[in-house]
Amino acid sequence: MTVRVAINGFGRIGRNVVRALYESGRRAEISVVAINELADAAGMAHLLKYDTSHGRFAWDVRQEREQLIVGDDTIRILHERTLDALPWRELSIDVVLDCTGVYGNREHGEAHLAAGAKKVLFSHPGSHDLDATVVFGVNQEQLRAEHRIVSNASCTTNCIIPVIKLLDDAYGIESGTVTTIHSAMHDQQVIDAYHSDLRRTRAASQSIIPVDTKLAAGITRIFPQFNDRFEAIAVRVPTINVTAIDLSVTVKKPVKANEVNQLLQKAAHGAFHGIVDYTELPLVSIDFNHDPHSAIVDGTQTRVSGAHLIKTLVWCDNEWGFANRMLDTTLAMAAVGFK
């Protein structure tokens, strides 16, 4: 069965989902039927073909009126401003990938369903009343056919949750802190300009900028036992892609740094293959651009203090890795059936 997908919002994640679908060779499993985006069709085609972070798309891309032609595939282009105007029933859409970054509560999901979609997957953390929040590789087996409105969490949640699970299962986590060192994003300014967050009024290319993050809440969403036991801060740095996460956890069992690395390396080659990777090469952020893993552990940076405080550095391509997980979760949602 080929899952018929529509994408709502063709920004960074929406475009990378399409690219990842074609590059991963999963077109027999997922077919993009339609894309809803307020921007003009010519701009959509151009930005799919040419990308500053990920280079030229290997497939031929062209636009013909309100159609996007990718290779031999024709994708219908829509420009609807309201969810109730979307023709998902007419197009027999199985799963809508809502990549707007704007919608994310149950009401929005229900609007997609009312328009005829069978299921909805948000590309960002959603409200607590959604049917499920999935971090693929960790909890997708909890999905059921009746889970129709689902969140794929965030790129940083997908990065850190597998590592937290591995450390907790092995050593028992007491508490932890997380610092996200995140590439600049579209909600920042090219030059100084107004923003409700005064730090984000400043030019993104000229400063390291602290921003608010809900990552601690994202961790608790997946692992409720860590409520009030994790804190997180975030800074944006003047790069356009790839993120590093500094994870520090206090654990119950005594451990050495080499034992932590052995655990994470074994997981990367075993149970978490394709989700977690491990390296001891002297790499920098650009080297992880276009990496499909959710998390890449940098074993050279693992430290243990007093046998109970573990510090790790985990990398991710916050666009490409997450786009690949969107595809994984879509297939997992379809695999459990539709009600």
From Swiss-Prot:
Molecular function terms, GO-annotated: erythrose-4-phosphate dehydrogenase activity; NAD binding
Main location group: cytoplasm
Entry keyword set: Cytoplasm, NAD, Oxidoreductase, Pyridoxine biosynthesis
Active site: 155
Location in or out of the cell: Cytoplasm
SMART domains to which the protein is assigned, alphabetical: Gp_dh_N
Binding site for NAD(+): 12-13, 81, 318
PROSITE patterns: GAPDH
Catalytic activity: D-erythrose 4-phosphate + NAD(+) + H2O = 4-phospho-D-erythronate + NADH + 2 H(+)
Gene Ontology BP terms: pyridoxal phosphate biosynthetic process; pyridoxine biosynthetic process
Keyword Oxidoreductase included in the entry's annotation: yes
Binding site for substrate: 154-156, 200, 213-214, 236
UniProt cross-references to Pfam families, sorted A to Z: Gp_dh_C, Gp_dh_N
Site-annotated residues for Activates thiol group during catalysis: 182
Family label: Belongs to the glyceraldehyde-3-phosphate dehydrogenase family. Epd subfamily.
NCBIfam families: E4PD_g-proteo, PRK13535.1
Subunit and partners: Homotetramer.
Function statement: Catalyzes the NAD-dependent conversion of D-erythrose 4-phosphate to 4-phosphoerythronate.
Name by which UniProt lists this protein: D-erythrose-4-phosphate dehydrogenase
